[in-house]
Amino acid sequence: KAKLAEAGGFKGDKITLSYNADAAHKEWTEATCNSIKQTLGVECVATGVVDFATFRTEIGERKMKGLFRTGWQMDYPSIENFLSPIFATGSSSNDGDYSNAKFDTLLDEAAAETDAAASNAKYQEAEALLAADMPSIPMWYGKTTMGWSEKVPGVKITAFGTIDFSSVSMK
């Protein structure tokens, strides 16, 4: 509450946290709103949007008011695939309209690098800027739970959280 007051307080009568109602988001968004109410003393309402397509349209057309949930599944295993599409100025998935010239420059420099270690170092610098600016609030990350037996050795999980069936064998 002290930090909120220091930042100028909350302007408005309530916070709205929107989610697509055609998936399992109601429970955690309501829990998040309850936490906001209890911690900050600010009214918060979790509001479902009928389906994902409508939800994404409202976000894309900048009709969404207040907070909204989002998520990202990497297309390929690289830090770049989390930074550029979501946070680069003008990127199609930059739903929060984040813009930082230094961040964009670091992304460009990282992409131009021919050395993977140097490229990753630039991406990590850009990531540090995101941590300082905090344009979105990471709530959690997904995880995959798998099980197997001694009769099925060598099971490997891909970077996408699925079984690499080429690694599976039977004893």
Regions found by a protein language model. Give the residues of each.
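Ligand-binding clefts/hinges and TM-proximal coupling segments of bilobed small-molecule sensing domains
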Residues: 112, 118-141
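Short, solvent-exposed loop/beta-turn-alpha elements that line the ligand-binding surface or hinge
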Residues: 57-63, 84-112, 141-171
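Solvent-exposed loop/turn segments at secondary-structure junctions
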Residues: 21-25, 52-53, 73-77, 128-129, ...
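Append "and occasionally in soluble cytosolic enzymes with long acidic Gly/Pro-rich linkers
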Residues: 1-34, 38, 125, 169
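Periplasmic binding protein-like
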Residues: 35-87, 122
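Soluble non-cytosolic domains of exported or imported proteins
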Residues: 22-30, 49-53, 97-101, 113-120
